[in-house]
């Protein structure tokens, strides 16, 4: 073959929709030509090249595989929605809140839901039976056991049964052997009972063959317009290494603000609004574009009509301040530190909670709507919440921000695909 001559298709391979070209030096080509029928160096070279390409193809295939996910204590399914958005196949959500499960099923593709009391470990049999009947091999188990028992925010007792609800996840992991387990909770868990609570979780998973490590993630660093910290325990089955948590994607000066997140939504000052609404304007920021990507109508954006007294009090609170900014005749009525807190338009919001009476819109004299709270939690607008307003606020506040789940899910794929790197790949 002449130098520079055209070889049809030589060194090219289509991989995941892209064309890759490998340069093969003429000396190697000559060796291949001279020994084409032998079993000498040409076979080794051809084999190495083909093996490399097939390994890359296999890697792409495994990266794009829809790993199965089971969500325990799912609530509305914020954590598993993040996994779904990262290309995973969410197959089942389990919780005891019937309306939250209705929301879960409506927003997780073909996933089903199951109402079970997970404090009763006998109910785990139903989960196992459901998966076995459908020949579903579980890849990933995720869950956020109720945090009230662990949280530093409320009364805690060592014998609070909610402190042990995480053991349902241990039992499911022991029975179904998922490749990875992600357990989410409040950061205070790491300090609870002088760290003994967290240590027990680690030991329980280690005893059934998992390498487990906790880490606190700060939501604004991952593109979520909300000051929220959560601890994640990530356990890898029969792994020699700990999970490396994803690196932050934003610096403080880049954090998404309240205004970035919700300024395109109807004002609803003094009115309730409709169940289904049109957007009043195009997206104003990249974050709004992302939230509206798959939505053409607006849901869960119903306002609240406050009393004249409440509106008067709210109107006197500047951006980013709370009741302490009021004249003493009013401020003395409040004791709770976050009472009458107004969001700041140029900062992320405070932590969204299950209540909805303490925080107020940065501009309008009302509490945020369910949709505004959902935006601040990184729920996209096509994620529709069911139930009455109180139930919807609870679902939003209890959830893990989907975007946090998304970043963990992408990072986890690096570990799930490693299982295949030592497999024998046939080539000819």
Segments predicted by a language model, with ranges:
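Short Lys/Arg-rich basic patches
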Residues: 1-29, 33-36
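Bulky hydrophobic/aromatic "packing anchor" residues in well-ordered structure
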Residues: 24, 217, 262, 352-353, ...
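Core alpha/beta nucleotide-donor-binding catalytic domains of modification enzymes
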Residues: 61-177, 187-191, 196-198
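Class I S-adenosyl-L-methionine
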Residues: 129-135, 153-330
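C-terminal target-recognition/interaction regions appended to catalytic cores
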Residues: 282-428
């Amino acid at each position: 073959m002449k130098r520079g001559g055209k070889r049809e298709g030589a060194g090219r391979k289509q991989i995941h929709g892209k064309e890759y070209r490998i340069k093969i030096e003429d000396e190697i080509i000559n060796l291949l030509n001279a020994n084409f029928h032998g079993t000498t160096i040409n076979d080794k070279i051809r084999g190495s090249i083909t093996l490399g390409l097939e390994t890359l193809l296999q890697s792409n295939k495994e990266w794009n595989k829809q790993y199965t996910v089971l969500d325990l204590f799912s609530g509305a399914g914020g954590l598993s929605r993040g996994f779904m958005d990262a290309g995973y196949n969410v197959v089942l959500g389990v919780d005891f809140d019937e309306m939250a499960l209705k929301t879960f099923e409506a927003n997780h593709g073909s996933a089903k839901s199951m109402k079970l009391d997970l404090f009763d470990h006998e109910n785990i049999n139903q989960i196992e039976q459901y998966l076995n009947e459908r020949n579903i091999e579980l890849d990933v188990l995720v869950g956020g056991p109720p945090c009230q028992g662990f949280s530093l925010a409320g009364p805690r007792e060592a014998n609070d049964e909610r402190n042990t609800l995480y053991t349902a996840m241990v039992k499911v992991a022991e029975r179904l052997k998922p490749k990875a387990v992600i357990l989410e909770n409040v950061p205070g868990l790491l300090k609870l009972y002088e760290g003994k609570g967290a240590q027990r979780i680690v030991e329980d998973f280690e005893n059934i063959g998992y390498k487990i490590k906790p880490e606190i993630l700060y939501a604004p660093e991952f593109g979520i317009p909300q000051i929220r910290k959560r601890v994640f325990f990530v356990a890898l089955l029969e792994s020699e290494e700990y999970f490396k948590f994803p690196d932050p994607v934003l610096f403080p000066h880049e954090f998404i603000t309240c205004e970035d997140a919700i300024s395109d939504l109807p004002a609803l000052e003094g009115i309730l609004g409709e169940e289904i609404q049109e957007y009043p304007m195009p997206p104003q920021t990249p974050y709004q574009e992302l939230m509206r990507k798959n939505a053409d109508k607006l849901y869960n954006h119903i306002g609240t009509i406050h009393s004249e007294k409440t509106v008067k009090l709210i109107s006197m609170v500047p951006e980013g301040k709370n009741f302490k900014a009021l004249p003493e005749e009013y401020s003395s009525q409040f004791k709770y530190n976050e009472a009458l807190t107004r969001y700041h338009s140029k900062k992320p919001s405070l932590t969204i909670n299950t209540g909805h009476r303490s925080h107020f819109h940065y501009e309008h004299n009302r509490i945020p709507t369910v949709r505004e709270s959902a935006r601040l939690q990184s729920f996209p607008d096509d994620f529709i919440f069911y139930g009455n307003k109180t139930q919807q606020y609870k679902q939003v506040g209890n959830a893990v921000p989907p975007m946090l789940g998304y970043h963990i899910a992408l990072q986890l794929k690096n570990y799930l695909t490693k299982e295949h790197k030592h497999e024998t790949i046939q080539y000819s």
